[in-house]
Structures are given as structure tokens and as C-alpha cells.
């Protein structure tokens, strides 16, 4: 592989970052995958697969592993960041002085900035400046299915039309991976954060034993909360009927591959928050996202009762069943109400 002519450098060698790197390489592109732990990267190189997360998917020959950040960033102008949302800003500040002058950045991170609840576009602008083209990809994607080449579709939004076109061409594969462009940069980002929260609620509902009717009602009203918050932030409401909204919401709320859903199920069954997190064994993005989405909703004066009750369970010690009964006991109202 040419050391400075890769199609994409992927920052983050977890399950999703690895799956996206494999997908790009399988599309015939030269790809560099960087991980922060040199020992982990050495293991990936030795095994030519991610044994911990994707043991049955060998790396294509065009996928190169790299533990030196400067070398990885010099390899391509296109940088795909796939790290947890709570370290997103830190990672961008780390890569800023090492990026090429012509660099363009896209992220697959879902969530908001820890503590502040800011959109990741604002974090990126603060860290990288106003000139670099930015993009985000989001949608219903479990890493194992994506890496296995099973049919998957996502949304792509960018601040730069040329970058959006280039990314769509790089990622799109007619056999298995559809990439839909969407001009709504805010909406595509927001959907991925809110769905994590609602997925915890769906898991709680199933853990309590409420059944399919309750789960479906929660998903539907969760979509209403997502759309309500999006409208307050200036997003296009139709975005939330697409891959980054409804698509990701349904997937995460209904399939046990979702860590957020499994986490919620444990809470619904009576397990405490810390024990449930420990049992999952990986980052549960929805735990932090709940606090961040609630903060954002308060800032913009948006009522989000499901999010509020999930927050009460996660951070205030409220019982999951009690939270569900609080929601069921709310006053009657028009389904189309903004409250």
C-alpha cells in the first residue's frame, strides 16, 4: 500500500470502526485503521481479524493497521472518526496538529458532547476550525452484520457537497451497503443520540415484562420526542422518518445486539445501574446520552417525558417500573400535542 495515498484513515479500532474499515477495504479502497492501544493493534495485525469483536471476518488485503497516529493521518486526506462520544473532542484535539492541510473529516460517532450536550458539529468546529469540510454518517448498523456484508443502509450529511459526493462513492456498495445523502446535518447527528436513550427505555419495558404493545408505544412516542427536539434545533422533521431517525430507533429498540437495549432490560429486571454496565462490558452510549439529551431539551425548553423518566432511573435511583407507571399516569392529551 502507498503510505500516503489511502482512500480513508479510520480512527478507532473498536467493533464499529473495524467494521467500517473492512467495508471500505472490501469496496476496493486502500484503508488505514488506527487504534490507540499498540498492543491491540499488534494483535489485529497478527490475527488479521478483530478476534474480540468480529472473530469470523478476516481483514481484506487492502486494510493496513497502524498504531502511530501521525503515520495514520499522513496516509489519507479523508479521516473517519469512530470513537465514543465522551472522548470525541479529546480525539479531535489530538489529531488536529497531525492532519494534512487538505484533510476532510467524517464521523460515525453517535451522541452529544459529555456534560454540555453540544452537537458534535460544534465540538468539531471548535477543535478543528471553520475551514475543514465535515460530515457525519448515521443509521441502523450493527457492526457484526455490516462486517459480514449483510445488507445495510445509512444516512450521510455534510457541510460540503463535494465531500458528501466523494464519501457516498467511497462507502456505497450496490451489493450490500446503501448510503443515502441528506442535507440535514443537525437531524442526522441528533437521531443517533436520542435513539440510544429510547432504546434503554424499550429495554426497561421488556425487562419489566410489559410486552410488544408497550414497546411499540414507547418507540412511537420516543420518535415524537426525537422529532420535537430536532425541530427546536432547526432540523428537518422528515429526517427522523429516515435511516438516522426511525431506522436506527427501531433497530436499537428491538434487537438484543443493542447494548443500550440489553442494559435497559437488566434495569427492568431489577439490576442496579453499575451492575448492568459491568455485565455489558462495553460502553453503553445511552447512559451518558440520556444526561446530555435531557440537558439539551432543558436548554431549548422541549418537554421529553420518556427521556426524563429514563434519567430518573439512571441518575436518581428511581425504580424502572415506577418510572413506567409515571409515564402511563400522565394526563390525557392530543397525540399531536407538542407536550
Curated annotation (Swiss-Prot):
This is Glycerol-3-phosphate dehydrogenase [NAD(P)+]. GO terms for biological process: carbohydrate metabolic process; glycerol-3-phosphate biosynthetic process; glycerol-3-phosphate catabolic process; glycerophospholipid biosynthetic process. The active site is at residue 195. Its main location: cytoplasm. The gene is gpsA. NCBIfam families: PRK00094.1-1 (NF000939), PRK00094.1-2 (NF000940), PRK00094.1-4 (NF000942). It is found in: Cytoplasm. One of its GO terms (cellular component) is cytosol. Sn-glycerol 3-phosphate binds at residues 110, 139, 141, 195, 248, 258-260.
